[in-house]
């Protein structure tokens, strides 16, 4: 679904708590956040980590497991960077399974979720977290950051 500017503004007015940047400490790490912070309190959290080298049938199996567990009440946690992770995020949002997304390049002061996440944020099924300051230029240590975010996702899931 495409949301035009007027609809975006209306959704932000209806749910200001989900569209306000805040500073928080999550698993002992200072982070910026936008979205539904209460998702951190859901007891069952599932980390998703898909190598770029997985075959589509392997991604599909992980996706099915995530969707089943999500429908049973789990929150899915991941940076959602790899194509497989992105497929899982998209499938989860289509059936209103909550996501905690760890962003690799921080959040600018005027941050607004991209189209694919906007409606999920308005519906309270999305939390975006980042331990990094905003960076618009190319990230030099991408692999290290990805590993850090996967480690943070694991820590969030262990609670």
For the regions a language model picked out, list residue spans one by one.
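Glycine-biased, small-residue-rich flexible motifs in mid-sequence functional cores and linkers
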Residues: 1-159
């Amino acid at each position: 679904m495409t949301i035009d500017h007027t609809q975006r503004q209306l959704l932000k007015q209806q749910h200001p708590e989900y569209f306000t940047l805040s500073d928080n400490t999550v698993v002992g790490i200072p982070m910026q956040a936008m979205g539904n912070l209460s998702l951190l309190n859901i007891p069952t959290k599932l980390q998703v980590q898909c190598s770029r080298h997985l075959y589509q049938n392997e991604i599909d199996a992980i996706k099915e497991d995530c969707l089943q567990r999500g429908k049973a009440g789990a929150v899915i946690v991941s940076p959602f960077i790899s194509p497989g992770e992105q497929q899982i995020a998209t499938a989860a949002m289509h059936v209103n399974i909550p996501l905690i997304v760890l962003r690799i390049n921080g959040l600018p002061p005027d941050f607004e979720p991209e189209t694919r996440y906007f409606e999920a944020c308005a519906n309270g099924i999305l939390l975006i977290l980042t331990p990094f300051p905003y960076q618009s230029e190319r990230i030099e240590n991408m692999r290290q950051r990805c590993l850090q975010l996967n480690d943070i996702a694991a820590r969030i899931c262990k609670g």
